[in-house]
């Protein structure tokens, strides 16, 4: 009897492991506290306004800051290595985009969401981070109304 219980348990464990391996997209809750990104440093590189984080070399602004939309889009350079914060099933990054959300009428950062494309499964996955709000707020005040180069 114990032998059958062991065999059935083993089959269930193997089936569960296989189903987890076949998942193509890793979903994360908004504003995940466990993110490795805890600080944003604003820098300028070759005329592009960039955000340097602990996970990526640089992120280039591709959309003007628009108060009416209460958001700004950033994009990273391609062919970045995947980081552990994206989950164990992600092996590579083809591209990354970041959108920051703000409260109406004021450049107070209230959220941020990134989406990344992994060529291993041809799917977009989403993850969100906490940022250094004060640093990015100062950046917005300094660059408000300026166009991207």
Residue ranges and their predicted role:
Residues 3-10, 15-149:
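Function-determining sites in protein domains
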């Amino acid at each position: 009897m114990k032998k059958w219980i062991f065999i059935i348990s083993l089959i269930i464990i193997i089936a569960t492991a296989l189903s987890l391996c076949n998942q193509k997209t890793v979903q994360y809750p908004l504003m995940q506290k466990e993110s490795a990104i805890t600080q944003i440093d604003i820098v300028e590189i070759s005329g592009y306004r960039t955000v340097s984080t602990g996970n990526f070399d640089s992120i280039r602004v591709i959309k003007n800051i628009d108060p009416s939309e209460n958001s700004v889009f950033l994009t990273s350079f391609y062919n970045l290595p995947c980081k552990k914060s994206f989950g164990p099933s992600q092996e590579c990054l083809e591209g990354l985009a970041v959108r920051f959300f703000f409260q109406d009428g004021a450049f107070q950062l209230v959220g941020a969401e990134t989406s990344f494309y992994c060529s291993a499964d041809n799917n977009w996955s989403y993850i969100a981070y906490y940022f250094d709000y004060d640093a990015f707020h100062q950046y917005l005040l300094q660059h408000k109304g300026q166009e991207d180069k």
